[in-house]
Amino acid sequence: MEQSSQNWFSSVETPIKVTGRDAVSWDESRDLVVVGFGGAGVATALQSLDNGLSVIALDKFAGGGATTINGAVVYAGGGTSVQKEAEIADTADNMFNYLKQEAEDIVSDETLRDFCDTSPEMIDWLQDKGVKFGSTVWHKKTSYPGPEYFVYHSDNSLATSYKKHATPAARGHRGYVPIEEGRKATNLGYSIFNPLKQSALDKGLQLETYHEVRQLVVDDNQEIIGVMALYFDNEKLLKKYQKLKQRAERLLMILPPILPGYNFFAKRAMAVLEKAKALEAQRSQKMIEAKKGVMLSAG
């Protein structure tokens, strides 16, 4: 589909085509450019920094994405350090036997096995970067436990049909937050995201917020060599834009969509967002070279 099509509803634009790297006057240059700095983006940035790459991360807004507004839940098992502390018996084989019933042939056994085998390592990796988990257990099936509990049965392993082939184990891991704060169950993802972000910054990450990427830059060989980002180079305009976005977010969070009255606040939020959108036309362009690659993790 061409961008000129009446059915093109995305803000993404066709790539900027150049003859080569030397044909561009780059404003920034890094080994890796990460587009979208939420959970996937920060994990990619951290791993790349650990591997010795220079990294710049760009986010259209303040960063964090859906990761920061969720309940801070990580699904993990196979004998994680948190499970062991909570005296929950689980192994990678047991986790595989359960998930194989759920996934059937949707993913290959090799991929599923790798997920189960490396699950404890993932929790260790998160903890090494500063993420803290609680170990109090809610022993029944639930979509989300009370604020006092940090490990719970987030899957269906307690169901009779699944217990025939695998021993039930609590695998929902919640990032630790104070109990009173945990009562709201949303906007708790900072307990996972913030430590990862700080770790990445400490390792040398260059983070640029309120930088929207709509176009890749490609050369004659169709190799992706960078991105073009839109940003506010006027501090006053940026602050005005941020205030409008924050106001709209507050309006949208007043009520969940399923409750009466949500549409009233949603319409007010949309009106505020239109004002913010009008400011976007005053942004400037920034050309950023990616010497080794571009990671798209923008949701």
What residues fall within each predicted segment?
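Extended, non-globular alpha-helical segments
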Residues: 2-23
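Conserved redox-cofactor binding core of oxidoreductases
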Residues: 11-14, 116-284, 291
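Core beta-strand elements of the Rossmann-like FAD/NAD(P) dinucleotide-binding domain
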Residues: 25-30, 281-293, 297
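N-terminal Rossmann-like FAD-binding beta1-loop-alpha1 element of flavoenzymes
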Residues: 30-57
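Redox-cofactor binding/interface segments in oxidoreductases and associated redox assembly factors
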Residues: 35, 76, 296-297
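Glycine-rich FAD pyrophosphate-binding loop
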Residues: 50-71
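Glycine-/small-residue-rich beta->alpha transition segments that form the dinucleotide
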Residues: 61, 233, 292-293, 297-299
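Glycine-rich active-site loop/strand segments that organize a redox cofactor
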Residues: 75-115, 127
